[in-house]
Amino acid sequence: MTLDTIIETYMPIAKPLSMAMERQKKHISLIIFKRKIIAVGQNIFKTHPDTLRLGYRTADMHSELDAFRKVPKSLRGEKLILVNFRFNRFGHFRNSKPCSVCAKWCGEVFHKIYYTDDNGLQRL
């Protein structure tokens, strides 16, 4: 998939989800398998034991981990694609590059990782 194809296909799904969030930083993570969305995650500001186990400084859950928890166990290990979106209140792209902790474990479980920044979609 090209970057343009990813934007055209998945942005219409991610943008309304992001814009509906009441948080200032509206991160949405989509996990894709065979061009289908199999999991959606968002930043969650409540404690979860996986966040501390993976080495996060706080117990808040990032959108990548929230989405990955929803992936069926039968698909873990397959060629999954992670796409992170973040939009400002005007609907423009903002930086949603995975933090260093997310980047480390995501690099081990995802075949490809994409994220938005002020210039559009980038590949990690």
For each feature predicted by the language model, list its residue ranges:
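Short, basic/aromatic recognition patches
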Residues: M1-K25
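Gly/Ser-rich catalytic serine loop of serine hydrolases
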Residues: R23-I28, S96
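Zn2+-dependent cytidine deaminase-like catalytic core
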Residues: V40-L124
